[in-house]
C-alpha cells in the first residue's frame, strides 16, 4: 500500500470516526439502513470554480471528500465554515493564513503534510506551485449542495 493510499484511508476513517456513536451495525439478518457508495475520482470530471481552481467532490450522509487542483498562484479567499476540515496536500505546496492559539499566522504546507481546521476557524490558501489538495469535511458542506458557489469562492483570483 503506498503512502497516498494510507493517507486517503486515514482521511476516510477520520471522516466517519466522529459519527460512530450513532452508527447502526447491520448484519445479513437486518435491514440495511444506509447505502454504500463507490466512487472513482479518476473518472469524475473536475469543475472550474475559480481562477486557477478546479474541484471534484462527493459526499455521503455525514461527510464529504474533495480534490482541488490548484494552478500556481491560485487563491482561495479568507473564509470559515461550521465543518471540521482535514487538508492533505498530495503534491505541490500552499501558503495558508489561519488562526492558531488566537493569533493570525501563515504556514506553508507541502506534499505529504496534513493540516486540520476545527469548525469555524478561518483560513485562506495561496498555491505556491501547482498543487493537488485532498480535503475531508465533516459534516457535509451544506453551502456546496446548491448550484450557487459560496460568496468567498466568487472572489478567487490568481
Question: Which positions does each model-derived feature cover?
Answer:
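Conserved short histidine dyad/triad with adjacent acidic residue
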Residues: 66-80
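A short, N-terminal "cap"/entry segment at the start of jelly-roll beta-barrel domains
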Residues: 21-67, 130, 148-158
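Glycine- and acidic-residue-biased ligand/ion/polar-headgroup-sensing regions
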Residues: 82-95, 99
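Bacterial N-terminal signal peptides that target proteins for export
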Residues: 1-7
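Histidine-centered metal-chelating micro-motifs
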Residues: 75-76, 95, 114-124
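Bacterial N-terminal signal peptides
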Residues: 9-18
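Short acidic-glycine-tyrosine-enriched beta hairpin
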Residues: 101-119
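Ligand-binding loop in jelly-roll beta-barrel domains
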Residues: 119-143
